[in-house]
């Protein structure tokens, strides 16, 4: 059974989720809501994308709705999530991608319009957090609003899980070298809460904070308090990379660690965790579906208990694919797929 899905917020992630859904046989996007984008502009933004290229399909506007590859997509422009009539199109599963309604209470407003479950495409201060391949099997059907965590947590957690399960992580530090995002500035501008974050994105490497490493402790409880990290925002449009430095309890050579990651990428984490020995750079992974692509050649070890691991991720495309995978999984558990 195909899962009918609605998207609230047709910004960066909302549109990339939509594009991913075209390739996802188990998902049917039936409705979109965005109070700040009218249908003609939505069609334009969906069709043309500076990072992922032109949409490979047919997009038209029919009244207040979109027609994509011959299929009608209801388009709403409600500011209040409680007023979006999701039930009219059978959109019982909603992707909350505005970045605004990230608490459980705010996300559950969608239920008033007929939605049954809401997946928040961002970290949430109080909603249960799930990362595919790591803790998704702990989902219970009574959960109405849940978070797909962040793109960085989705990259870091599968790798950390493999290393911890095999060698036991004592402690670690993470740095994500992260492409700029919409929250940054085209030119220097005011940013009272983060002075460095107000500097122009395309000219600077900008140190920043991230909760991604600490969030791993929420999806892998054994690592709670053992990981923390920071971000370096860099002048690239897409694709980011995690640098994870850990002390491990059970000593292992770097070759042994590579083999463990390779086996996981071909087994239980296939499609989520990748492995490469190619001499890749960031643009080579633009549009990659996986959450995390381990770069075997980029890592180093000081000794058998202290190692630096490097893993890439398309922070837009790969993350959006996991949003859909999580939706399909919870629908299956709920008995609706």
Curated annotation (Swiss-Prot):
Belongs to the glyceraldehyde-3-phosphate dehydrogenase family. It comes from Cochliobolus heterostrophus. This is Glyceraldehyde-3-phosphate dehydrogenase. The gene is GPD1. SUPFAM superfamilies: Glyceraldehyde-3-phosphate dehydrogenase-like, C-terminal domain, NAD(P)-binding Rossmann-fold domains. One of its GO terms (biological process) is glucose metabolic process. Keywords: Cytoplasm, Glycolysis, NAD, Oxidoreductase. It catalyses: D-glyceraldehyde 3-phosphate + phosphate + NAD(+) = (2R)-3-phospho-glyceroyl phosphate + NADH + H(+). It is an enzyme of class 1 (oxidoreductase).
